């Protein structure tokens, strides 16, 4: 199912930019960040890992008239990534809870922005239609840096400007408290667990703007029990 907030009839975005993809508000979505990508899922929008997905896989999806979001972390350094050694120690902060080998980044630093620009260029060069930059709410976390809400807004808008400048759509991942300030800069929202935490109402501005909201719920019952899954879809 497509899990999204219902707030009445959506309206089309005003003057959509024809230079990058604009997923429709009712798009279907397949997310897979590990393992050999399945290319047989009947979804209009796929999401795969930026680093682990080949240009050949992306071309195969395009041949099936699929669109692709490429996932990467924009707010953390993951020690297993090919460019991990390019992040100076001065921009590496506290570890992410429950994610070994991953630390928060100082998003105010020009070197971090330079490296994220290169990741966006990689997405463009591989043929991704858009990107899903994760961990863009570090100002709310124990990052090891004195990040402010203004720092986060500036960084997230930087990511959106750079992505659009390269012809890429861009999703806002979580960062619920800044949605009203960022909805005009992003093409869709991707959220984790808004039903579990009763936070889905924060996402209404995207639906009102005619932009999709894609939701992930991690509770085992939604994967193992079809009735629970259907109930979740009905509530959404």
Regions flagged by a language model, labelled:
Residues 1-20:
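Bacterial Sec-dependent N-terminal signal peptides
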Residues 15-236:
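Glycan-processing catalytic domains of CAZymes
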